[in-house]
Swiss-Prot record:
The gene is mtrB. This is Tetrahydromethanopterin S-methyltransferase subunit B. The keyword ATP-binding does not apply. It is found in: Cell membrane. Part of a complex that catalyzes the formation of methyl-coenzyme M and tetrahydromethanopterin from coenzyme M and methyl-tetrahydromethanopterin. This is an energy-conserving, sodium-ion translocating step. Keywords: Cell membrane, Membrane, Methanogenesis, Methyltransferase, One-carbon metabolism, Transferase, Translocase, Transmembrane, Transmembrane helix. GO terms for molecular function: tetrahydromethanopterin S-methyltransferase activity. GO terms for cellular component: methyltransferase complex; plasma membrane.
Length: 100
């Protein structure tokens, strides 16, 4: 089994990650790779913004992130239209069931 190099995750504390086992520990003299976490932090920030937008979508008075101005109440309108369509379809199913 080939030994993967350790990934230094906290240089000030000499903490490294062993990618083969997923264990975090101190560096013991093996080859160490120092990684920049900037790209990962940007992706995490984008994911957090998406998660916040998803949580905010539960409140029908909020505005979706990145939407055009004047879109207040779009979730409320979408919810009403969805319920109207579901009610219409359910009504048709019940009507056909009663007629047959």
């Amino acid at each position: 089994m080939e030994m993967l190099p350790l990934v230094k995750i906290a240089p000030e504390y000499n903490l490294t990650l062993d990618p083969s086992t997923g264990m975090i520990g101190a560096a013991l003299g093996r080859e160490v790779i120092i990684l920049s976490m900037d790209e990962i932090n940007e992706q995490i920030a984008a994911l957090e913004a998406t998660a916040d937008d998803l949580i905010n979508s539960l409140d029908p008075t909020t505005i979706p992130e990145g939407s055009y101005p004047g879109r207040e109440g779009v979730y409320l309108t979408a919810g009403k239209l969805t319920n109207i369509v579901y009610g219409f379809i359910l009504g048709l199913i019940i009507l056909f069931a009663l007629l047959l």
